[in-house]
């Protein structure tokens, strides 16, 4: 695949993720948009690692690290959302201010 195609796809995924993160009012949707952003970053890391330094796997290793962080976020995020839902009876971001009683 050509470099331009991967970069356009990655920019498209990143833009969708940023737009969804800014406009979403639901916590689950915000977590999904955050995953889109992380996947776009991983695509760029692997692409540029292959393009500039194909013998050393620094970009690939760093993308595996980002995938591990995303897996931890995917495990902890829904647990936090369900805990907030149990206490506040809502998953809307603007209604879940935990600093107020």
Swiss-Prot record:
UniProt enzyme class: translocase
Gene3D superfamilies assigned to the protein according to its UniProt record, in alphabetical order: 1.10.287.3510
A Gene Ontology molecular function term of the record: oxidoreductase activity, acting on NAD(P)H, quinone or similar compound as acceptor
Keywords: Chloroplast, Membrane, NAD, NADP, Plastid, Plastoquinone, Quinone, Thylakoid, Translocase, Transmembrane, Transmembrane helix, Transport
Pfam families attached to this UniProt entry: Oxidored_q2 (PF00420)
Residue ranges of the TM segments: 2-22, 32-52, 61-81
Domain of life: Eukaryota
Name by which UniProt lists this protein: NAD(P)H-quinone oxidoreductase subunit 4L, chloroplastic
Organism: Nymphaea alba (White water-lily)
Higher taxonomy: Eukaryota, Viridiplantae, Streptophyta, Embryophyta, Tracheophyta
């Amino acid at each position: 695949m050509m470099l331009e195609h991967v970069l356009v796809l990655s920019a498209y995924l990143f833009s969708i993720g940023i737009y969804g993160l800014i406009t979403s009012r639901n916590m689950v949707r915000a977590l999904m948009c955050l995953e889109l952003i992380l996947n776009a970053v991983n695509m760029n890391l692997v692409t540029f690692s292959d393009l500039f330094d194909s013998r050393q796997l620094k970009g690939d290793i760093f993308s595996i690290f980002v995938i591990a962080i995303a897996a931890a976020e995917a495990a902890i995020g829904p647990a936090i959302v369900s805990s907030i839902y149990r206490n506040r009876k809502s998953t809307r971001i603007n209604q879940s201010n935990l600093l107020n009683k």
